[in-house]
Amino acid sequence: MKINDPDGENIIYINERLRNKIDKIPLYDITVIDAPAGYGKTEAASFFSKEHKDEVRTISVLSPSTEIFFYDLCDALGQYDSGASVLLKSIGFPKNDGHIAKIREIIKNIRLQDELYIVIDNYHLVSCDEFNTLISSLAGNMNNKIHFIMVMSYIDSQIVRNAVESGNILYIGKEYFVFTQDDICEYYRLNGSDINEEESNAIYGLTKGYVTSIELSLLQQKVDIKDKIIKNILWDRLSDKTKERLMLLFIIDSVSIKEIMDFKISLMTEKELLLFMNTSYFIEYDTGKCRYCIRDIFKDFLKEVITDTEKESKRGILEKAGAVFIKRDDFFAAYKCFYEIDEWEKIYGSKPEFHKIYPVLKAENKDFFMKIIKEC
């Protein structure tokens, strides 16, 4: 997490738990840094790079193209062994066990005088069985001063999970990035704002230690412009389709990948869904419930966005939300969505079994049901 230094120097704040893990990187051939968007994993890699300067080469993966990524990797290694780079390029990105074996031997045979750390940022974009097998086979078997640091938003490979569990790979997960109440106090102090324990606990309760949310809370304390910052820095940069997905997730409260696939909520593949859910600043994953939801700090903003959106512009979103609630047997929530966009046929065509609608036939819901009856 960056600090607003009065001298203009780019300072990165790293909590003690994370610093202790980063200090172990030189002891491993392979390091996996795994955390969703907004936790500061790229900043952590930058912190390590700053401390090791000439020993680090960073590859920023910007697309799912494995060929472009592999050529960038070859070029990075070519700065130290041009012959190895030529051999690797002649093989190309590994497509089978034979390729993996050849590439593995070429990398293992590179000899360096000094340590070399290859940081691969956004590795999740090119993660695949072949390269994961290669990386896993190199873990603990290099002995040539080359280290790979894989920075990713999520792990979708059992191969990588198995390698992490074997102990041959240094794993730095989300739990090391989450701020404690003490971390929050220290971060505020370094940014010129002292807070007490009660205030720190309140911020932690709202943000759950999520780095980006804490940054927004700090900005809100300095000037009451949190929603404007969310809009200008985060929201306005999103595509219309992404905005619709986030509004839908806010309305339906939470969702699992399985539910999305079973209910056909999205046309995205499971891999595309994992990428979207784990690289959005707005979304968090509840490990206890195994469900994705909107982060608390963004809920008021999204509620206002939905309220301000014209009926016709959010018709598709509310229709999808209503359909999800119907499949969940939450008819009352579904009717609220359909009512807002005058979808009377969907309300009266739902025909719920009595035992499913009975729980919501309560006095506090009387006015809403009377509206449905009068306005149909």
Language model features with spans:
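Conserved NTP-binding/hydrolysis module of P-loop NTPases
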Residues: E67-S90
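C-terminal leucine-rich, beta-strand-based interaction scaffolds used for sensing/assembly
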Residues: I252, S256-F332, E343-W344, H355-K356
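Alpha-helical sensor/transducer elements of the RecA-like P-loop NTPase core
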Residues: E43-A45, T133-A202, T212, L216, ...
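Conserved P-loop NTPase "ATPase switch" module shared by AAA+ and STAND
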Residues: I106-F131
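Amphipathic alpha-helical "lid/sensor" segments that cap RecA-like P-loop NTPase cores
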Residues: G38, I169-Y171, Q181, E186-E244, ...
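N-terminal pre-P-loop "Q-motif" helix
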Residues: G8-I22
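A short hydrophobic beta-strand->loop->alpha-helix junction that borders the nucleotide-binding pocket
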Residues: A35, R57-T66, G92-F93
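P-loop NTPase Walker A phosphate-binding motif
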Residues: T31-I59
